[in-house]
Design a protein with these regions (language model features):
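Preference for extracellular/luminal or secreted protein segments
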Residues: 23-58, 107, 288-354
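Glycine-rich, aromatic-flanked loop segments that form ligand/cofactor-binding clefts
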Residues: 85-114, 129-156, 177-202
């Protein structure tokens, strides 16, 4: 059993959602490091560019995401993640390596499980779903991946749901989705990989993907409540170390994109969630709302999202880092908020990274 699996197994049985012990006091880190820890960036090719490795060594990047374009073979991926980790080790900074391995059509490593979609997995029962989660995490851990941006916790309960059309939801029944999401998440943790439940507070009522359009879910809080059921259960079970925040806007929660909404973040924390939050890819949000990448990131950071996710060219995020650092130095991003996010990210990395 690897150290990561042992730690992750302890998390499952201890119940992470009940809250973790506070970290010992230490000297305040510089703003540059606090800002860098929050950026998750894409990799431009099947190898890491010199500029990306340099940014990791300088502490300007806290994580990377691997997409299909970064994948040629298992040995190649392992060499890539090893080089990324080596750069982080030189700097003494944690680095989270992420991917999307939901199953079905959303699978960056085509040879790795789960081959079945969430919809197909939903017919297998909780024990089998947990096994599939464990198989997935075992494969990802061998590749050097720490975080799976899965499972989808959305409840596709309306006609025309894009989640249902893409077979990405476990069930239209909230309690069934809750059980299946909890089982798959527990399976990922069994193998030492952190799950990231998505897309809070739910995309089950959306008929279009936020990757393609600005989406507003015009529903009351009572209509949205069933979409919170999977999160409540997974948080209570201690199998939700990470939650991804939706790019959709919700009229019930103020009408701005959830990733920019302090109200949505407060709703999640009110469910007892003490882990790390991450945005969905910020490029589509910036495009559909006609703002720069830096503006999209700043708004999410101000709302309280911990990790800011970018899947496009790595070089495009250098200006984002500079803009965030300028906001921090001007006091428009509070040090207290930056330190709180950094503490959550460091705890996550201590358990799963490497």
């Amino acid at each position: 059993m690897t150290r990561r699996v042992a730690l992750a197994t302890a998390v499952v049985f201890a119940g992470l959602a009940a809250g973790a012990a506070a970290a010992p006091e230490a000297a305040s880190p510089p703003l540059a490091k606090l800002v860098g820890a929050r950026l998750v960036v894409g990799v431009d090719s099947t190898t890491a560019s010199p500029s990306l490795l340099a940014r990791i060594r300088r502490g300007q990047v806290g994580g990377v995401i691997l997409m299909g374009s970064n994948v040629r073979s298992a040995p190649q991926v392992r060499a890539l993640t090893t080089s990324l980790r080596a750069a982080a080790t030189i700097a003494g900074n944690p680095l989270l390596v992420m991917t999307d391995q939901e199953g079905g059509t959303v699978r960056r490593f085509r040879w790795a499980p789960p081959s079945a979609s969430a919809e197909e997995l939903g017919s297998l029962g909780e024990a089998a779903i947990r096994r599939r989660g464990h198989e997935t995490s075992t494969a990802l851990e061998r590749l050097g991946v720490d975080v799976d941006l899965a499972p989808v916790a959305d409840v596709p309960s309306v006609p025309g749901s894009f989640i249902a059309a893409q077979h990405r939801g476990f069930s239209p029944v909230p309690t069934r989705t809750a059980k299946d999401v909890t089982a798959f998440s527990a399976g990922l943790l069994d193998g030492g990989v952190a799950p990231a439940l998505k897309h809070f507070p739910g995309l089950g009522l959306a008929t279009r993907s936020t990757d393609d359009a600005a989406v507003t879910i015009d529903a009351g809080a009572s209509a949205l409540a069933p979409g919170l059921v999977p999160y409540r259960r997974a948080i209570a079970a201690g199998v939700a170390p990470i939650v991804m925040i939706s790019n959709a806007a919700y009229t019930a929660y103020g009408g701005q994109p959830a990733a920019w909404s302090p109200r949505v973040l407060a709703l999640l924390r009110g469910l007892g969630f003490t882990g790390v939050t991450v945005t969905d890819a910020l490029e589509p949000l910036a495009t559909t709302h006609r703002v720069t990448l830096a503006q999209a990131a700043i708004r999410a950071a101000r709302a309280g999202v911990d990790l800011l996710l970018f899947v496009g060219p790595e070089r495009s995020t250098a200006a984002v880092y500079d803009a965030l650092l300028a906001e921090a130095r001007a006091g428009r991003l509070s040090r207290a908020g930056l330190e709180a996010s950094a503490a959550r990210i460091e705890e996550l990395a201590a358990t799963y990274a490497g």
